[in-house]
Amino acid sequence: VIINGFCINTKFLYTIKFYIQFNNTILILLFMFEGKKILITGGTGSLGQALTQRLLDMEVETIRIFSRNEHKQIEMESKFQDERLRFFIGDVRDQQRLEMALEDIDIVFHAAALKHVPKIEYNPFEAIKTNVIGTQNVIDACLKNNVEKAVCIGTDKAVSPLNTYGSTKLLMEKLFVTANNYVDPEKHKSKFISVRYGNVFGSSGSVVPLFIEQIKKKKNR
């Protein structure tokens, strides 16, 4: 490409364009979360902790970690040692506790879910109570507290699901997306968003560690 008489490599231009777009996205995120009060359901999980770390790097006012794992909360509190962190012991199955935890919250990240596929296959209704009914509880609590935005952490397993886990995650996403249909803009400012990810390295429910172990065994043969 010729610009002002200079020949510039096209790949270089694409790199510069990507760099500018990436940094603009970072700036948008920084302003989006600045001064916000955030709650993360399932916040003691691997994804919840990674999200917490990223949010703490921004100028958030406070982050509430909502989970039923008391031991992990203690570990997480010791790990981060940040006065902006608050910890709530609770379960998404408990509507009343959710409503209390979401008081004055601006943004919710809903990461709480049962996700170990074999266990869920033998305990399907438990998965429904947490992943489906629990998600509806989160939606209702968000509406009651007039939360600005709620983000459901979905999964690629929800695409043409082959097991109970994928099916419940698909229902989670559908509940979040359809929640926007019955939100009265005159009464509620809440917006519900669903995002998807694949197998997360380091996640307790990820298949990645299994793949690594299989590769190691194959090498040792």
Question: Residue ranges of each PLM-predicted region?
Answer:
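Conserved glycine-rich Rossmann-like NAD(P)H-binding loop of the short-chain dehydrogenase/reductase
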Residues: V60-K72
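Conserved Rossmann-fold cofactor-binding substructure of NAD(P)-dependent oxidoreductases
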Residues: I89-I107
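Short, conserved SAM-binding/catalytic segment
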Residues: M76-E83
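Conserved residues in the N-terminal Rossmann fold of short-chain dehydrogenase/reductase
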Residues: S67, I89, K129
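Conserved Rossmann-fold NAD(P)-dependent oxidoreductase catalytic core, especially the SDR/UDP-sugar
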Residues: I107-H110, L114-K174, T178-P185
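N-terminal Rossmann NAD(P)H-binding glycine-rich loop of SDR-like oxidoreductase domains
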Residues: L39-R54, M58
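NAD(P)-dependent short-chain dehydrogenase/reductase
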Residues: T164, L170-R221
